[in-house]
Amino acid sequence: MALMAVLLPGALAVDLNVDVGFYFKQSRGGTCTLASAAMMLRRRAYLDGMDSWVDVTENGIKSTAWSGGLSHSFTYNDMHVGYATLPSGKAAKTGALVSILAEHPEGIVLYDRTRPHAVLLTDYTDGVFYCSDPSNGVASGRVPLSAASISIGGASCYWYITEDGNDDGLELLEEAVQAEEAAAETETTAETEAAAGEESGSQDWWTSLFG
């Protein structure tokens, strides 16, 4: 188990909500969606245990992701990104986003047409939505969505990673860890049962002598 812990990538050992360098500001006006998508892909690459996650940048994904705006479908380094719309009504949007984030720990690009502006929505923790807003007018890093330039009520659509071709290695490691934990649990159970058997045998012997 100790060896397995050494082999695990940082993504399994470190909370994604702890910023290790995921976030940055957009390079110029009008590229909030591109910057947010780059941060999303960066977090996903980190989650996959890829050392190259630090190389995922706004300019780096532009050639494949940008066409006068963020493309509704594109692929970067075997990570496929798609586009979807949100239901109407704040309550329905909130419920949908909570479910989406549960399936996408890397986050999603959330777009508010009323601004217009986009952020990387990172997580929903203790009843609060968090994000990283690429706008220079908002604090850097992971902040509550209430401190950002958009709102849940105004949000209408989002981009998310629909398929990831880089997570096979991570899945194998997770399976190996689960196998190690199961083996350790089985061994502990066997030892407990053996000890119980020995105690029962001792009691039977004592009873045969003095019973």
Question: Would you name each region that the model predicts?
Answer:
Residues 9-13:
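Sec/Tat signal peptide C-region and signal peptidase I cleavage site
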